[in-house]
Amino acid sequence: MMITFMAWCTGEDLKPRPFSGFTILAEHIRPDARGHVRITGPRPKDPPAIRFNFLETEADRQAALAGLKHARRISQTDPFAECVASELTPGPEAETDDELLEHCRANGLSLLHGVGTCRMGTDPTDCVVDPRLRVHGLKGLRVVDASIMPRIVSGNTNAAAIMIGEKGADMILEDARA
């Protein structure tokens, strides 16, 4: 779990509100659920079918609850507590786990750093690229970015994406010399 503090108040749309406040985001950075992206047609302009599978596993639901409850506890400690007039979202009326999960389902979102849409692995029925980043079943095409990560790293993906780019460049050069 990563806790992010913002020195402004946001609503469910994450847009700043025209009054003073702060926002605490509880970000589950290693979810268990796996989504997918599928091609829907032969044309490049055909929109993809995207299934996020947010909160599909019990572990993810428990992590969301723990993060939200932890953010609430933080807001009740000094010096935060003296700044809080009221909780805007999910709001003090959301008390039970079911109510809190409903808030998470309705308002949870993916923040940046999507990975795994072209997952790397040896099984072409389950993975897009092989361990040398070549697209299974196609000659001359590689994917060299964060989309090849089989699972997301525990934090910002920038360093891992740079490493993938460096390693991918090395592989391309090695294969060109062979």
What do these predicted regions represent?
Residues 1-160, 168-178:
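FAD-dependent oxidoreductase catalytic-site/capping-region signature
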